[in-house]
């Protein structure tokens, strides 16, 4: 074994019928973790159920119930390799209710592939004021996914037929929007693709093909390989937000999540915030292999001693008891940008916050100041209200214990989305946190250390 390739997490985003799952499934089918026999079985099942065109998307539908409904819900983790990287795909679904999933999923991604449907009418629907293309791109940026690739998909559609004009029109429109969001458009490759036929996904299209005649850029895999390697904050203290907690027969309690900063290893004493519970880590596993240490970007399960499943919850944060352990917060100050709220927001507003894997109602207890969203300059102290388009510094108080951090110290734990009325009404970045001291319980194994 040579040096292990670096892991890169991808989130695939885009409007509901852009072809995300088909493109993703095709990638995994060709380059990754699914054996050919399983695919043949899927093909047969899909055909029998009259969903032949969902063949590759089917690859991503692990659950029987999901299959019959024809939509992908679970944020599934799937792997494939290129010459340079080991990619893990977090399949983020595109239906409106799943934006919450997307927020917690996206905070794990190093790179976003934004899949857009090129056919006339479909592209416009995705980018319209209430289309998901816009919202997904904005969320990805705010949640710290700084690298993006746009796949101009469904180029094989009979109304597009690999048209250079349509590709240029769609690319130009996307550039305008991506610039507004904060991306630098020349740095975002726009790759014409067909998730269904596989054209320009894995290799460049030859000159005899309608696309090859005018397109000389990279295929999707080449664009992925050309991404910058993510910088991993290994030297920071451990922060690992829990995504789930399992009880596994014969093993015990196994919290699961992604290491955001620092490292976790067997024998370490860890503290969970906001409860303050401390215990010893027995073992750490990734993809069913025991590890001596896991670092930033690794999705792991770890076994903890003498802890009941009831003591841990999704949204809790695990850290090193001896090195800046995480704590719950009494309140925090955040810079918030209001995206789409129909009315005025006053002090006392209490929407749901999605921060890392936590999902908790928080009150805007004080509107501290209103600012210019581009320059950050102060416009007004203690505004009476804020509305769509405004940026403000706000003091927030959570309705129940939660653990967050300042964005400058621990970026993945310092950004959040504000949800209300089933949509994302605002996004924010945490500037400072007032920590809460708690007397946490310590298990016997932790006390010995």
Curated annotation (Swiss-Prot):
Keywords recorded for this protein, A-Z: Cytoplasm, Elongation factor, GTP-binding, Methylation, Nucleotide-binding, Protein biosynthesis
Function, as annotated, reads: This protein promotes the GTP-dependent binding of aminoacyl-tRNA to the A-site of ribosomes during protein biosynthesis.
Q: Name the segments for region: G2.
A: 70-74
Q: What is this protein called?
A: Elongation factor 1-alpha C
Q: Which family does it belong to?
A: Belongs to the TRAFAC class translation factor GTPase superfamily. Classic translation factor GTPase family. EF-Tu/EF-1A subfamily.
GO CC, any one term? cytoplasm
- Outline the segment boundaries, as ranges, of region: G3: 91-94
- N6,N6,N6-trimethyllysine modification sites are 79, 187, 310, 400
Query: Is-annotated flag, keyword rRNA-binding?
Result: no
Name the CDD domains for this protein. EF1_alpha, EF1_alpha_II, EF1_alpha_III
Positions of GTP binding: 14-21, 91-95, 153-156
Q: Where in the cell is it found?
A: Cytoplasm
The UniProt entry, under SUPFAM superfamilies, shows:
EF-Tu/eEF-1alpha/eIF2-gamma C-terminal domain, P-loop containing nucleoside triphosphate hydrolases, Translation proteins
Q: What is its main location?
A: cytoplasm
In the record, N6,N6-dimethyllysine modifications are located at: 55
| Pfam families (UniProt xref) | GTP-eEF1A_C (PF22594), GTP_EFTU (PF00009), GTP_EFTU_D2 (PF03144)
Tagged with keyword Cytoplasm: yes
Q: Where is region (G5) located?
A: 194-196
Q: Which GO terms describe its molecular function?
A: GTP binding; GTPase activity; translation elongation factor activity
Q: Which InterPro entries match?
A: EFTu-like_2 (IPR004161), G_TR_CS (IPR031157), GTP-eEF1A_C (IPR054696), P-loop_NTPase (IPR027417), T_Tr_GTP-bd_dom (IPR000795), TRAFAC_GTPase_members (IPR050100), Transl_B-barrel_sf (IPR009000), Transl_elong_EF1A/Init_IF2_C (IPR009001)
Which residue positions does N6-methyllysine occur at?
Answer: 265
Q: Tell me where in this chain the tr-type G domain is found.
A: 5-234
What are the boundaries of the region G1? 14-21
Which NCBIfam families does the protein's record reference? EF-1_alpha, PRK12317.1
Q: Per the record, which residues fall in region G4?
A: 153-156
């Amino acid at each position: 074994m040579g040096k292990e390739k670096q892991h890169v997490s991808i989130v695939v985003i885009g409007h509901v019928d852009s072809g995300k799952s088909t493109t993703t499934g095709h990638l995994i089918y060709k380059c990754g973790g699914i054996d050919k026999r399983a695919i043949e079985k899927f093909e047969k099942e899909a055909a029998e159920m009259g969903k032949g065109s969902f063949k590759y998307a089917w690859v991503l539908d692990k659950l029987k119930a999901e299959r019959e409904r024809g939509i992908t819900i679970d944020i599934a983790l799937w792997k494939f390799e290129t010459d340079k990287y080991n990619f893990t795909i977090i399949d983020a679904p595109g239906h409106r209710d799943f934006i919450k999933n997307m927020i917690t999923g996206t905070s794990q991604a190093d790179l976003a592939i934004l899949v857009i449907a090129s056919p006339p009418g479909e592209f416009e629907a995705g980018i319209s004021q209430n289309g998901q293309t816009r919202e997904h791109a904005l969320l990805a940026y705010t949640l710290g996914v700084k690298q993006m690739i746009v796949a101009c998909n469904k180029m094989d559609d009979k109304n597009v037929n690999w048209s250079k004009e349509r590709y240029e029109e769609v690319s130009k429109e996307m550039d305008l929007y991506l610039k507004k969001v904060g991306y630098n458009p020349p740095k975002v490759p726009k790759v014409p693709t067909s998730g269904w036929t596989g054209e320009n996904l894995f290799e460049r299209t030859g000159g005899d093909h309608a696309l090859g005649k005018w397109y000389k850029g990279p295929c999707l895999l080449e664009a992925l390989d050309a991404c910058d390697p993510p910088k991993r904050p290994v030297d920071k203290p451990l922060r690992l937000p829990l995504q789930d907690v399992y009880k596994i027969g014969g093993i015990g309690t196994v919290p699961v999540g992604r290491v955001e900063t620092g490292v976790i290893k067997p024998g370490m004493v860890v503290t969970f915030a906001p409860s303050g519970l401390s215990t010893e880590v027995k073992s750490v596993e990734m993809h069913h292999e025991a590890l001596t240490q896991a670092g930033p970007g690794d999705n792991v399960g770890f076994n903890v001693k003498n802890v009941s499943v009831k003591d841990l919850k999704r949204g809790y944060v695990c850290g090193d008891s001896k090195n800046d352990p995480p704590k719950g917060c009494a309140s925090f100050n955040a810079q918030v940008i209001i995206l789409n709220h129909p009315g005025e927001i006053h002090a006392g507003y209490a929407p749901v916050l999605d921060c890392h894997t936590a999902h908790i109602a928080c009150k805007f207890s004080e509107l501290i100041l209103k600012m210019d969203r581009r320059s950050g300059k102060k416009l007004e102290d203690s505004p009476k209200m804020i509305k769509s388009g405004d940026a403000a510094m706000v003091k927030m108080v959570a309705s129940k214990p939660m653990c967050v951090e300042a964005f400058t110290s621990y970026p993945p734990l310092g950004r959040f989305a504000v949800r209300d009325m089933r949509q994302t009404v605002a996004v924010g970045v945490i500037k400072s946190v007032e920590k809460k001291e708690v007397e946490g319980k310590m298990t016997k194994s932790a006390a010995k250390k």
